[in-house]
C-alpha cells in the first residue's frame, strides 16, 4: 500500500497540538512543544504507582517512531513480520481500506474476531477466572 501509493502515515507527520489536546482527558498537561515532531507514543511501563490522568507516566513520545521503526530510530521490523502493525491511526486504516476496496470491522465484528469466534464466555479462554498465565 505505502509503496504503491506513496502514502505517509500520521506517525510520519508532525502532530498538531490542538488535535492532541482534544483527544486527552481534561487536565492532562500539554506535551512539550519540542515533542511536536513526527513520531508516535511508545509504551513505557512505570516502575511505581502513577496518577492515571497523565498518560505521560506510561506512554512516551518517541521522535521517529512509526510502523517502520516501532521503538523509534534504530528499531526495525526484522523479526516482527508476524506481529500486528503498530503506530497506525484510524485515518491510516481508513486510507488503506479505501485503497483496498474494503472497510474496517464494526465494533461487534472486531470483538468477535478478537475472541476467536468464542461466544457466551467471560474470557477468550472460557469462564475460568484469569491466572498468572492468562493475563
Language model features with spans:
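Intrinsically disordered, compositionally biased low-complexity segments in eukaryotic proteins
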Residues: 8-11, 16, 55
Amino acid at each position: 500500500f505505502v509503496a504503491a501509493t506513496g502514502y505517509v502515515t500520521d506517525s510520519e507527520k508532525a502532530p498538531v497540538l490542538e488535535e492532541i489536546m482534544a483527544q486527552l482527558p481534561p487536565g492532562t498537561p500539554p506535551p512539550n512543544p519540542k515533542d511536536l515532531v513526527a513520531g508516535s507514543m511508545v509504551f513505557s511501563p512505570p516502575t511505581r504507582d502513577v496518577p492515571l490522568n497523565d498518560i505521560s507516566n506510561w506512554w512516551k513520545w518517541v521522535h521517529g517512531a512509526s510502523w517502520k521503526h516501532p521503538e523509534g530510530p534504530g528499531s526495525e521490523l526484522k523479526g516482527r513480520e508476524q506481529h500486528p502493525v503498530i503506530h497506525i491511526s484510524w485515518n491510516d486504516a481508513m486510507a488503506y481500506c479505501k485503497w483496498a476496496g474494503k472497510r474496517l470491522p464494526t465494533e461487534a465484528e472486531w470483538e468477535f474476531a478478537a475472541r476467536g469466534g468464542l461466544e457466551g464466555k467471560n474470557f477468550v479462554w472460557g469462564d475460568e477466572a484469569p491466572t498468572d498465565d492468562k493475563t
